[in-house]
Amino acid sequence: GVIRGERTDGAMLAHAVDASESSQPRQGVRGLVIATFAFVTVFAASAVPIPLYSEYKGAIGLTDADISATMLMYLFGVVLTLFLSGSLSDAAGRRPLAAASLLLAMLGCFLFLRAADPTIVLVARAVQGVSCGLAMSAVSALVVDSAVGRYEGFGLAVAGCGALLGVMAGSLAVGFLSLVTQQHALI
């Protein structure tokens, strides 16, 4: 810390002030907010198709075996990416991989939106797996790197729980929207 002296009643008070905790730079807080939003958003996007699988069953003939295969494709994408992205994050930087993670999340959602057969659903889920693998490694590290000083605990909490929050938010949002649009169609 930095020692700063103040005069009070003729006595010199010296106390330590940690410069990183005294005031978080505006840029740092903004970076933390953006990284947190990106992290939670990627996992929210990965949860979007889950409540819609029953809709896909009727619309494109998705079977229970296909749904099981989507889980395997997702896990394969996550695991493969986790093996490769740690060193890639160190070499290329966290921000480019965070951007790639968000772009892949959007691509996965677009593929689900346009899915005309079960194969597209499987590919979309694999893309989401890669997106989440990048988020687990590079984006969570970006969150922690951005969380300095008094925000360090928040950054660690986001890195530890942000994925669960995103999955919950994405599932609830799509489930709610599906319910509302079905009720609206009935009216």
Where are these predicted regions, by residue range?
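Central cavity-lining transmembrane alpha-helices of secondary-active solute carriers
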Residues: 72-85
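Helix-loop-helix hairpin linking two adjacent transmembrane segments in secondary transporters
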Residues: 162-187
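Structural signature of the two symmetry-related core transmembrane helices
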Residues: 97-110
